[in-house]
Amino acid sequence: MTDELKIEGYASLFWTRDLNDDVTAAGAFSDSLATSGAGGVKMLHQHDDAEPIGVWDEIVEDARGLFVRGRILRATPRGRLVAALVEAGALDGLSIGFRQVKARADGALRVLKRVELWEVSVVTFPMLPGARLTVVG
C-alpha cells in the first residue's frame, strides 16, 4: 500500500442536467482555472472543508466536461478512510463546490455559464449522476 491513491474522473459533464436542474455550459470553468489552477481547488470528502483529503494535480476542461486527476493522501485519518472506501467501491462519485458568477434561466433549468470553482469532493451521491471517479494507481 502506498501513501496515496491516484484517482481521475469527470467532476462535471457539459450540457448534462443534474438532479438540481443545473446544466453547465462548456467553458464555464475557464476563468476560474486560469486564475487558480488545480492547486487552488481543494479535494474534500462530502464537501466538508474541515479536513481536506488530498490534492488535485490536474483539472482541465475538455470536450466532455471538467476532467480531474489527483491523489487521496493516506497521511490523515480521513484520507485513509476515503481511500479504503474508494478502493472497495463504496465511494465513486465526484461533486463540485462553486460560486455562480454568470447563469441564465432556460425553462426549469439554470444554465451555469461562468463559475468560480472552489473544490471537488469525493462523494457518495453526486448531484450529477455521471460524475464518477476511477482508481488509476
Regions found by a protein language model. Give the residues of each.
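Residue microenvironments linked to proteolytic maturation
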Residues: 4-8, 58-137
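Structured helix-beta-strand junction loops
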Residues: 36-39, 88
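Polar/acidic, low-complexity leader/linker segments enriched in S/T/G and N/D
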Residues: 1-37
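Flexible, active-site-adjacent loop/turn segments at secondary-structure boundaries
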Residues: 12, 27, 31, 51, ...
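Short, flexible beta-strand-to-coil junctions
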Residues: 12-16, 46-49, 99-102
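Short, structured beta-strand-loop surface elements
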Residues: 44-64
